[in-house]
Curated annotation (Swiss-Prot):
Compositionally biased region (Low complexity): 384-404
UniProt-listed InterPro entries: Kinase-like_dom_sf, MAP_kinase, MAP_kinase_CS, MAPK_JNK, Prot_kinase_dom, Ser/Thr_kinase_AS
Alphabetized PANTHER family for the sequence: MITOGEN-ACTIVATED PROTEIN KINASE
Name used for this protein in its record: Mitogen-activated protein kinase 8
Organism: Xenopus laevis (African clawed frog)
Bias (Polar residues): 405-420
MF GO annotations: ATP binding; JUN kinase activity; protein serine kinase activity; protein serine/threonine kinase activity
One GO term describing the cellular component: cytoplasm
Domain notes: The TXY motif contains the threonine and tyrosine residues whose phosphorylation activates the MAP kinases.
Regulation: Activated by threonine and tyrosine phosphorylation, potentially by the dual-specificity kinase, MKK7. Indirectly activated by Wnt5a.
PROSITE patterns (UniProt xref): MAPK, PROTEIN_KINASE_DOM, PROTEIN_KINASE_ST
Tissue-specificity statement: Strongly expressed in presumptive ectoderm and mesoderm regions and weakly expressed in endoderm regions during early stages of embryo development. Expressed in the head and dorsal regions during neurula and tailbud stages.
EC number in record: 2.7.11.24
Length: 426
């Protein structure tokens, strides 16, 4: 990795085929993840004296879709403040004007690993239950503001070695409006809910299906519904859970209904058969958590008909989860989204670019005026946020998360990993 000087405020790092032009306060950059939305580096923030993750968005103004996702992610990250949502620490661009603006950097908390790695561990009921509880708290916080994540998957959920969990990546998150008809290609295939696969309208509990898939993966150690395309994905679901009833079929669009009704009929399997006791850890003595409770929760999450699927609120009160219940976490005040038309907006690339640039300048102005607490004044076009600089342990400490080099690399996440085991719950 080579390093050269650009100007008095910024340093340049060559990271693979990409160039990171970052504030001098960010040192020792090291690539830790890459994906369609960007490249992520771990770095040390000399001002905050902590390790952070810096995400450079890949060609944010390549087209309208990329630009809209970049705007959505930035706006939502600026608004959300919850212990189970990844914290935004800084936003900056090295360019000095709208005309020059082309690179966007987002600085986040650095975590130790994602659930792809955690799933490979031998988790006891306490850890499994506590991780689920935190997922649900984060999701409820988003839903309280009408935000549907839509892309929940193991690589978008990160953890610290002390079992603290955070949800990240808001590039596909959507504010819930009056219409819920959306493309079926918004969620990584394996975790797509039936209503998404079948092009139906959907609401907040689309995220609950994804959580159920993740829980099932924790138990089995492998993907539940590994479809090769969206048709095969549907087949994988009904082969295990059974063909839905006529009542559900009536909700489908005529062409989709014809296809679904012409598929072979499957009786499905009971959850006792799909998830036998042998797959679970030993029953917990401390919190009285049992395989039967986890299986019951799973059976309420993995319900094909969304109208009969468990809600986030009810899931938080389920016996397998409510041992951790804390109103400060589960009932945190909803984030205030200033842009009520966040998803209805349609703009040209240049208009999106201007909107994003204004968000960066707004952040800078808030930092200057002390609205964003605990941070020094920004340099150049850089802006800094300390309001969410949580007191989580530095990633420079010896981490106890285990990793498997054969696992797929995380996509666009803020994590760093090292070998070991997952720490205790609170």
């Amino acid at each position: 990795m080579s390093r050269s000087k650009r100007d008095s405020n910024f340093s340049v790092f060559e990271i693979g085929d990409s160039t990171f032009t970052v504030l001098k306060r960010y040192q020792n950059l090291k690539p830790i993840g890459s994906g369609a939305q960007g490249i992520v580096c771990a770095a040390f923030d000399a001002v905050l004296e902590r390790h952070v993750a810096i995400k450079k968005l890949s060609r944010p103004f390549q087209n309208q879709t990329h630009a809209k996702r970049a705007y959505r992610e930035l706006v939502l990250m600026k608004c959300v403040n919850h212990k189970n949502i990844i914290g935004l620490l800084n936003v900056f661009t090295p360019q000095k004007s709208l005309e020059e603006f082309q690179d966007l950097y987002i600085v986040m908390e650095l975590m130790d690993a994602n659930l792809c790695q955690v799933i490979q561990m031998e988790l006891d009921h306490e850890r499994m239950s506590y991780l689920l509880y935190q997922m649900l708290c984060g999701i409820k916080h988003l839903h309280s503001a009408g935000i549907i994540h839509r892309d929940l998957k193991p690589s978008n959920i990160v953890v610290k070695s002390d079992c603290t969990l955070k949800i990240l990546d808001f590039g596909l998150a959507r504010t819930a409006g009056t219409s819920f008809m959306m493309t079926p290609y918004v969620v990584t295939r394996y975790y797509r809910a039936p209503e998404v696969i079948l092009g139906m309208g959907y609401k907040e509990n689309v995220d609950i299906w994804s959580v159920g898939c993740i829980l099932g993966e924790m138990i089995k150690g492998g993907v539940l519904f590994p479809g090769t395309d969206h048709i095969d994905q549907w087949n994988k679901v009904i082969e295990q859970l059974g063909t839905p009833c006529t009542e559900f079929m009536k909700k489908l669009q005529p062409t989709v209904r014809t296809y679904v009704e012409n598929r072979p009929k499957y009786a499905g399997y009971s959850f006792e058969k799909l998830f036998p006791d042998v797959l679970f850890p030993a029953d917990s003595e401390h919190n009285k958590l049992k395989a039967s409770q986890a299986r019951d929760l799973l059976s309420k999450m993995l319900v094909i008909d969304a109208s009969k699927r468990i809600s986030v609120d009810d899931a938080l009160q389920h016996p397998y989860i409510n041992v951790w219940y804390d109103p400060l976490e589960a009932e945190a005040p909803p984030p205030k989204i200033p842009d009520k038309q966040l998803d209805e907006r349609e703009h040209t690339i240049e208009e999106w670019k201007e909107l994003i640039y204004k968000e960066v300048l707004d952040w800078e102005e808030r930092a200057k005026n002390g609205v964003i607490r605990g941070q020094p004044a920004p340099l150049g076009a850089a802006v800094t946020d300390g309001s969410q600089a949580h007191t989580s342990s530095s990633s420079g400490d010896a981490s106890s998360m285990s990793t498997d080099p054969t696992l797929p690399s995380d996509t666009d996440s803020s994590l760093e990993t090292s070998a070991g085991t997952l720490g205790c719950c609170r």
